[in-house]
């Protein structure tokens, strides 16, 4: 579960390495896979598309807490990760690194198509 002040990895090539969750959309206290959060960039790569300290939207694609699937199996990722998106819900990067759990919302189909592995 992702809360405010959670440090997250960025799973795309937008130029950000680490972001800090500063808000959750929908009036919730915690976010899970597929939820949209407001983040601030903490560390960036040179010549990236994002700037340090700027505020962006992101969708959660991996969480460390175990997730139970409908068939009874449990998925647990090694890190919390997000993909940065613009206001229209399209990813800022052109690649998504690492596995991604299937996002239930139809608005993030582009992220699932860019991912290397969808669980």
UniProtKB/Swiss-Prot annotation:
GO terms for cellular component: cytosolic large ribosomal subunit. The keyword Oxidoreductase does not apply. One of its GO terms (biological process) is translation. InterPro entries: Ribosomal_uL14, Ribosomal_uL14_bac-type, Ribosomal_uL14_CS, Ribosomal_uL14_sf. It comes from the Bacteria. Keywords: Ribonucleoprotein, Ribosomal protein, RNA-binding, rRNA-binding. Pfam families: Ribosomal_L14. GO terms for molecular function: large ribosomal subunit rRNA binding; structural constituent of ribosome. Part of the 50S ribosomal subunit. Forms a cluster with proteins L3 and L19. In the 70S ribosome, L14 and L19 interact and together make contacts with the 16S rRNA in bridges B5 and B8. Binds to 23S rRNA. Forms part of two intersubunit bridges in the 70S ribosome. Belongs to the universal ribosomal protein uL14 family. This is Large ribosomal subunit protein uL14. It comes from Wolbachia sp. subsp. Drosophila simulans (strain wRi).
């Amino acid at each position: 579960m992702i809360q405010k002040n959670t440090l997250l990895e960025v799973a795309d090539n937008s130029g950000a390495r680490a972001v800090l969750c500063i808000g959750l959309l929908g009036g919730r206290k915690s976010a899970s896979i597929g939820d949209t959060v407001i983040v601030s960039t903490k560390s960036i790569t040179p010549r990236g598309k994002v700037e340090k300290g700027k505020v962006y939207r992101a969708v959660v694609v991996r969480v460390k807490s175990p997730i139970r699937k409908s068939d009874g199996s449990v998925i647990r990722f090694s890190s919390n990760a997000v993909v940065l998106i613009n206001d229209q819900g399209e990813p800022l990067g052109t690649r998504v690194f690492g596995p991604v759990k299937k996002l239930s919302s139809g608005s993030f189909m582009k992220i699932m198509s860019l991912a290397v592995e969808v669980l």
